[in-house]
Amino acid sequence: MGSFRFHEWLICEIETDDGIIGIGNAALAPQLVKKTIDTYLTPLVIGEDPFDYSYIWEKMYRRTHAWGRRGLGMVAISAIDIALWDIMGKITNKPVFKLLGGRTKEKIPVYASKLYSQPIKDLQKE
């Protein structure tokens, strides 16, 4: 787990049998998300083909059904899902947006908020 001064993050790494590492992240209650992944979701992912992402996602979704359809369970599933897409991109040598269907617009509007209240130089040092 890593952290900024004001916010903790969980970095989820999944390594394939071939040594390819996919990286996902979660920004809600990282200690609890880690426990959820380690205890409940990892056994559902080990040995699966990352390209069977819908099947894996459904297994994880059903496993967390009793917790509701938001919050901790969904954050944990999302961290794994992001890592699986990263693996697929690395295996195919394509950016994930291409795997998701490619470009849909000529231009994409950009949005930024003042989430980080420190100067960017200070954040880069962290």
Language-model regions, residue ranges each:
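N-terminal amphipathic alpha-helix/helix-capping segment at the start of soluble metabolic enzymes
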Residues: 1, 90, 94-107
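Short, Gly/Pro- and small/polar-rich lid/capping loops
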Residues: 1-13
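A generic secondary-structure signal marking the coil-to-beta-strand transition
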Residues: 8-10, 20, 76, 106-108
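Metal- or metallocofactor-binding catalytic centers and their adjacent structured scaffolds
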Residues: 15-91
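Metal-dependent enolase-superfamily TIM-barrel catalytic cores that perform enediolate-based chemistry
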Residues: 106-126
